[in-house]
Amino acid sequence: MGRRKTTLCLFLAAAFVSLFFLPTDRGATSQTPSAAAPRLTGHGRVGVYLTAYGLLREDILRGVLEARKAGKIDTLVINVKDNHGDVSYASSVPLARALGASTGLLDFRKLIPILRGQGFYLIARQVVFNDPILAKHLGYSNGWVPAADPTAIAYNLAIAEEVATLGFDELQFDYIRYADGGGLASGYEARYTAIDSFLAKVEASIGNKITLSVDLFGRVMWDWNARRTDPIGQSLEDMSAHVDYVSPMLYPSHYTEQKYKDGPYLVVKDAMVSGKKRTSTAIRPFLQVFDMAIPAGMTIDAYIAAEIRAAKDYGADGYLFWEPSNDYRALYRVLGVSYAY
């Protein structure tokens, strides 16, 4: 049944792409991995996040194409390994195959040339240490694997090395942290060291082959993060030293302070001001598009527009939009994209 489902999904993906994307030149349809092409710059990019299944949906593809044609987005962030532990393509990494994590849902060697032909900058999103499949295999009960676990390190490094050959412009690591929980305290230095060590290995292996970026909790931008007391183990200074871009997830709904819950502009402003004092690495934030904890009297459209204004006003090097179900209708309204589901 799994093989039949995968075959159907691949057929639908090919059909949707051929139907809803404009014809490309002959060179763009080559099956040769596009990693051999000149590396594109990631500066100033504006994009949306897509799940592997999002690429198989007609309505989502239509919206993405209309936004690209209108010149409002130029970047796609696509799952290559998600927080279920699933690898979205047919991986050759032995452990991915042994675990049954390799789904073969998407054929990036075919899809990437087509998407590049439409002018998209392509970011591969790899979830790292939140991996229920690997956690179960290694005997961890909470769906997470420690960043210091040798098998977790080797496995994720192997996936990253493989992804670097598929033709993406950039590889972005998400959930590159420990599980949240517990108060701020000393005693987490080993966690910071483990994450820094993993990124150093990645940089040494593929840093000259593909642009690298990391997703960070929004609170990592605050000055107190430099004290290294956060149980998640993310340090802005450490992590930014190994990558080309950092993407703090500046979702107002996730903050505890009411002024930030009610102030989408303020969240982005304060995070950018604080973060730029601590790192010279380009900051390209993720902005909230999902409808959660929107302040009374404010529309989701106004909420999104405020985030965008702050990102522009305070020197973000582009920005990315996050909606977990890939429903970007509100965003398209804000951007002035004429599109209807």
Question: Predicted segment positions?
Answer:
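Active-site groove signature of glycoside hydrolases
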Residues: 75-83, 144-146, 155-187
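Glycine-rich, aromatic-flanked loop segments that form ligand/cofactor-binding clefts
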Residues: 74-80, 103-141, 172, 209
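Catalytic domains of carbohydrate-active enzymes, especially glycoside hydrolases
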Residues: 61-86, 165-171, 239-245, 311-318
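Active-site-adjacent "subsite" loops/lids of carbohydrate-active enzymes
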Residues: 38-55, 112-113, 123-166, 305-308
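Substrate-binding cleft of secreted/luminal carbohydrate-active enzymes
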Residues: 243-268, 274, 279-341
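Boundary/entry segment of secreted carbohydrate-active catalytic domains
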Residues: 27-64, 68, 288-290
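Aromatic-lined carbohydrate-binding/catalytic grooves of carbohydrate-active enzymes
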Residues: 73-104, 335
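Aromatic-lined carbohydrate-recognition surfaces of secreted/lumenal glycan-active proteins
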Residues: 49, 121-131, 172, 192-233, ...
